[in-house]
């Protein structure tokens, strides 16, 4: 199978207002149905056979399942999605029938009050009901993504126990919990209020690993054994009961040499790197032009990977691709300096 996969941000709209996100300031113009279908065709013309639907909130897109069925008809062999889980209870069967093979669900707390505080909506029960519906009605692998912050790090064991209980009930490896470091990816984190929030809530990889010691031996495993291999993720086994993942790009200084993601933004831009200075408009082009543009970008990225497989790359213009809004200029050392000033000069990253 082609190493490349299409990461398709199909809408910038979202019904949550997470404290670490920038959804209020997103440029939210959606692509036309014809452009979406032609992008799917153009990627397929370049040998891409995997797709990951994102947003915004992809299930906020009314006809998302129609596009998934179209992708299935074109020959996409694997379809996955990242969602906040709010609509899952109502959409589980449709997603299953549209070709979904696995799903990432963003969930940062099991506490109802804290959930409302983090996402701005009283909807924890909706998300948990959605997870339960997916477990009962589909065979999808479920990856729960928890953004770990100072405010919720004490819940790490709750998430692991939740996965252990459900894996016993529905089958081994139905749920994988992934702990995501709160790292700078948002223009708001360059403003005074956002900067203070990030510095205060930032958690290191070591902090996460220390919370796992109560489960005994932690064994790192080959990430390629995990369905939906992500080169940025490290996976571990805990007592042979559960697989967990850790994404700590900030602690690792942004390794990106193995990335094969063709990214489409909700604003109709295409790139092969979130931190690339070259962001191309793909909407409005003919199918032939879309196919040619994707071919050129993939070829460019392959040459970069061939030259430097251990490449590390962090670009300063936060949010330009994710949110359609560019932040101030800054580099990774600026963020390390923020942490030193906020937490002490000897702080770990």
Q: Predicted segment positions?
A:
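N-terminal [4Fe-4S]-dependent radical SAM core
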Residues: 1-7, 17-19, 45, 233-245, ...
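Radical SAM/AdoMet-radical enzyme domain recognition
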Residues: 33-53, 57, 61-180
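Residue-level signature of catalytic and energy-coupling elements of molecular machines
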Residues: 10, 177, 268
């Amino acid at each position: 199978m082609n190493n490349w996969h299409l990461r398709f941000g199909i809408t910038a709209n979202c019904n949550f207002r997470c404290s670490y996100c920038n959804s209020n300031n997103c440029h939210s113009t959606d692509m036309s149905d014809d452009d979406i279908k032609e992008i799917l065709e153009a990627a397929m013309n370049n040998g891409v056979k995997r797709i990951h639907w994102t947003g915004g909130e992809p299930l906020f897109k009314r006809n998302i399942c129609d596009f998934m069925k179209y992708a299935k008809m074109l020959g996409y062999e694997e379809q996955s999605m990242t969602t906040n889980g709010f609509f899952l209870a109502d959409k589980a069967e449709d997603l299953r029938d549209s070709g979904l093979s696995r799903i990432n669900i963003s969930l940062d707390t099991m506490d109802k009050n804290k959930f409302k505080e983090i996402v701005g909506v009283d909807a924890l029960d909706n998300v948990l009901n959605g997870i339960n519906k997916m477990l009962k009605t589909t065979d999808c692998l479920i990856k729960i993504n928890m953004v770990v912050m100072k405010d919720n790090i004490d819940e790490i064991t709750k998430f692991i126990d939740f996965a252990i209980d459900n894996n016993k009930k529905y089958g081994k490896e139905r749920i994988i919990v992934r702990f995501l470091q709160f790292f700078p990816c948002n223009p708001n984190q360059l403003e005074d209020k956002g900067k203070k929030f990030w510095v205060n809530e930032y958690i290191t990889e070591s902090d996460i690993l220390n919370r796992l010691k109560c489960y005994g031996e932690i064994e790192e495993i080959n990430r390629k054994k995990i369905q939906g291999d992500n080169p940025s993720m490290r996976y571990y086994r805990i007592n042979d009961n559960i697989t967990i993942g850790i994404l700590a790009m900030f602690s690792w200084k942004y390794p990106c040499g193995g990335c094969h993601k063709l990214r489409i933004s909700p604003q109709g831009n295409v790139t092969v790197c979130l931190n690339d200075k070259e962001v191309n408009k793909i909407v409005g082009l003919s199918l032939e032009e879309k196919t040619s543009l994707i071919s050129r970008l993939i070829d460019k990225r392959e040459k970069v990977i061939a030259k430097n497989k251990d490449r590390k790359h962090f670009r300063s213009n936060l949010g330009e691709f994710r949110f359609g809004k560019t932040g101030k200029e800054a580099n990774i050392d600026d963020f390390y300096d923020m942490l030193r000033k906020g937490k002490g000069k000897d702080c770990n990253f």
